[in-house]
Amino acid sequence: MRLSPLDIAGVGVDLPEPVDVRALATAQGAPVDGYRGWISACHGGAGDHPSSMGVRALERALADARVSAAELRLVLFCGASRDYPPSWSVSTEIMRLAGASDHCLGLDTSAGCLATLTGLDLAHGWLALHGGGHAAVVAAERWSHTIDHGDPASSALWSYGDGAAAAVVALDAGAAGRLRFLGAEFRSRSAYNGYVRIEYGGTRAPVAPAGVDPHRRRVVGRSRDEVIAAYREGYAAAYAALRARFPAEPTHLVCNQISPGVVGTISSELDLEDRTTVTGHETGHLGGPDVLVGLRRYLDEEHDDQAVVLAASASYAFGTGLLVADRSREPRPPHGPPSVEPAGTRKGVTP
């Protein structure tokens, strides 16, 4: 089944201030010699929750798209973090805060750091089945507090950061997006489920033992070489399926991952080295928001590629999506300064 392309009508981000993760580790007594991850990571403050960061990102995306919240038919929340446990809904809270109508449906989805790409695919199909219109894909993570910066064994996770990003998308709605989403392809590695996990709070271990931090996230049981091999195989398979499905020749990659080395592995596997938009140097690894923060930067930098790949993954699934430029449309006036700014200011899109 071939769907009409999904217009990327607007993209907005909301990012807390970055911190130096090496300084945090040093202050907690961990050695930083040989650390290979991102140096900076955005860390949220008291008012930075998935719903509050998410609605700020969505409001900026709506302004960028010149669309009102009342026009949204679907809001997908694609983060793993939540203000409260289920069945409390982050997407529905974002709808309430943004002023969406009762005709809008809120859905919370989860696929780790891959969820924004799966969200774009889901929104595409949902809008097609429901006659078109506008939807929002919102990703927000607040997970820096789950990382032990004093544990050298967790150094691969030190750069986990907090933040949010949102895309307003449209199908057959006369949107004026510069890029159009054609679709995505995915490959899974289910044996890697749980490679990064929080041990406590679920039904298997609802309460942590005395003296144990119940929120602590850790890496479990895989060597780096195993993980890199899985990433190479997963991305290669997903990308081959994408290229077989769509004839466009991609010339740019938007991707951010847990470390510069992992981004390099992905870009080389996709043969898009030196043609990659990366944001980890400023933000760290944000999970679901990464791909939209990168897309916002790509749009701000006004590249002229005809086809762009979005790449994202969790440890257990890998995906690539394809965006193509719509050259038939007149460019709109600039909406404001770049959204991924130097340290020292709250980062977002100023309409």
Question: For each predicted feature, which ranges?
Answer:
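Acidic-glycine-rich active-site phosphate/pyrophosphate-binding loop
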Residues: 28-33, 85-99, 137-146, 261-272
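Conserved beta-ketoacyl condensing-enzyme motif
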Residues: 8, 48-111, 117, 245-263
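Flexible, glycine-rich active-site loops centered on histidine and acidic residues
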Residues: 124, 128-163
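Condensing-enzyme catalytic core mediating Claisen C-C bond formation in acyl metabolism
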Residues: 1-50, 153-229, 326-351
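Glycine/charged-rich beta-loop-alpha catalytic/anionic-binding loops adjacent to active sites
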Residues: 35-41, 74-76, 96-109, 146-151, ...
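Short beta-strand segments
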Residues: 110, 135-141, 169, 309-313
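Claisen-condensing/thiolase-fold acyl-transfer catalytic domains that form or cleave C-C bonds
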Residues: 55, 81-83, 87-88, 101, ...
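Short coil/turn connectors at secondary-structure junctions
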Residues: 2-6, 70-73, 101-104, 129-135, ...
